[in-house]
């Protein structure tokens, strides 16, 4: 099982927190000290917590469960979309719509609308409309795809959330908490860890750090799914041998 190590985190700047004046006392036990008025996160505490979260995600993936990746701020969006797509997981990279979990019935209707518009765009329906109507539908399609494109294949509520910047995604965390959906979150020194089941104390702004979190989580999903596939193949191969004996 491949896990994150101290060198990976140091190289990515995971240990750099926020300015000391913005700190949240609830994160005090994860802070090593301060340098130039910047809090330094204790990576000796982050390391086992990060790896525990990865193990949890890998086990979820083994059970064919869905992990929803959430990162809507500018520095995270692109990385979230790319890594989620790499491991075939749903994601929200643009803006969290209120009720995305707690009012999923309405969201499902919007996803159906998105799919209908995608079909119309491909089958020539748009070309048969007036320019004004075609433009309106194209804009509607673009808007829905930006908001819901990452979850259109989710099929139902996710089994866990992985969140970059828990302050920025507090609405998503609150909705997950209401529904009993486990939350894994990167929590910086200025944030509150409340509502997060698997806390990863770390820098939630640096692109290299976000790449490490997302890449590691995507790898964990892939490992979990490959473990299931590998286990099935191994069983099929061993069955004839057992029969021969």
Curated annotation (Swiss-Prot):
GO terms for cellular component: cytosolic small ribosomal subunit. GO terms for molecular function: structural constituent of ribosome. One of its GO terms (biological process) is translation. Keywords: Ribonucleoprotein, Ribosomal protein. PROSITE patterns: RIBOSOMAL_S2_1, RIBOSOMAL_S2_2. Gene3D superfamilies: Glucose-6-phosphate isomerase like protein, domain 1 (3.40.50.10490), Helix hairpin bin (1.10.287.610). InterPro entries: Ribosomal_uS2, Ribosomal_uS2_bac/mit/plastid, Ribosomal_uS2_CS, Ribosomal_uS2_flav_dom_sf. Pfam families: Ribosomal_S2 (PF00318). Belongs to the universal ribosomal protein uS2 family. This is Small ribosomal subunit protein uS2.
